[in-house]
């Protein structure tokens, strides 16, 4: 079924062969509950608990392709979620740092990605993804899997010169767009909105009191 999904995504316009091969090699059904496994290859988001979803395959493929990974990059992912996107990044990049704010999802991803799949190039943290992972920065690529009203300043600061960030931008109940932010070697940023999308909102830890 993964092979058929990759072939369908190719027909839908995904052109990066490495992205399609990674999708073909990874069983999406492992990242959803057993009662939803029959729907794992449908092109729609599926619930994963805690009010969160695994994104539809086309959007996952589009975002991954938009990163323009060549292999070897240091990647920050904000929103581990089910771990499916994380596992794809692990196949395509050098090293992946992924942050998840929901404790239950963070624990589940750790068990699946590190213990079951043994992904040695993946680092996981439970915390506020909008703050990034400062001690591991800078990152050549940043991927955000929840929508923020604007690009979080901490993530912008952690994007390396020559780097590329892909993220949904917009309010939770209004129009959202997928934005690609590129930082030139001179530090100057350019951005482009490339796809209308609908994502769950990026959540934050409450301030310390």
Swiss-Prot record:
The gene is pcm. GO terms for cellular component: cytoplasm. This is Protein-L-isoaspartate O-methyltransferase. CDD domains: AdoMet_MTases (cd02440). It is found in: Cytoplasm. It holds the Pfam family PCMT. PROSITE patterns: PCMT. Its EC number is 2.1.1.77. Belongs to the methyltransferase superfamily. L-isoaspartyl/D-aspartyl protein methyltransferase family. It catalyses: [protein]-L-isoaspartate + S-adenosyl-L-methionine = [protein]-L-isoaspartate alpha-methyl ester + S-adenosyl-L-homocysteine. The active site is at residue 55. It comes from Anaeromyxobacter dehalogenans (strain 2CP-1 / ATCC BAA-258). One of its GO terms (biological process) is methylation. Catalyzes the methyl esterification of L-isoaspartyl residues in peptides and proteins that result from spontaneous decomposition of normal L-aspartyl and L-asparaginyl residues. It plays a role in the repair and/or degradation of damaged proteins. Disulfide bonds: none annotated. It comes from the Bacteria. One of its GO terms (molecular function) is protein-L-isoaspartate (D-aspartate) O-methyltransferase activity. Keywords: Cytoplasm, Methyltransferase, S-adenosyl-L-methionine, Transferase. NCBIfam families: pimt (TIGR00080), PRK00312.1 (NF001453). InterPro entries: PCMT, SAM-dependent_MTases_sf. It is an enzyme of class 2 (transferase).
């Amino acid at each position: 079924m993964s092979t058929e999904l990759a072939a369908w995504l190719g027909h839908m316009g995904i052109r990066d062969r490495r992205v399609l091969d990674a999708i073909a090699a990874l069983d999406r059904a492992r990242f959803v509950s057993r009662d939803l496994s029959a729907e794992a290859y449908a092109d729609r988001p599926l619930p994963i608990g805690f009010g969160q979803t695994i994104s539809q395959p086309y959007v996952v493929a589009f975002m991954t392709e938009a990163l323009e990974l060549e292999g070897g990059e240091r990647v920050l992912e904000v929103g581990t979620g089910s771990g499916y996107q994380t596992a794809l990044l692990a196949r395509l990049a050098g090293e992946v740092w992924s942050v998840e704010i929901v404790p239950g999802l963070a624990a589940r991803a750790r068990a699946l990605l590190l213990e079951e799949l043994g992904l040695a190039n993946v680092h996981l943290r439970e915390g506020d993804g909008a703050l990034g992972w400062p001690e591991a920065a800078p990152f050549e690529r940043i991927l955000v899997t929840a929508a923020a009203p604007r690009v979080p300043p901490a993530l912008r600061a952690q994007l390396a010169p020559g780097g590329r960030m892909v993220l949904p931008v917009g309010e939770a109940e209004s129009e959202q767009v997928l934005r690609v932010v590129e930082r030139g070697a001179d530090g100057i940023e350019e951005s482009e909105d490339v796809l209308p999308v609908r994502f769950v909102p990026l959540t934050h830890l409450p301030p310390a009191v």
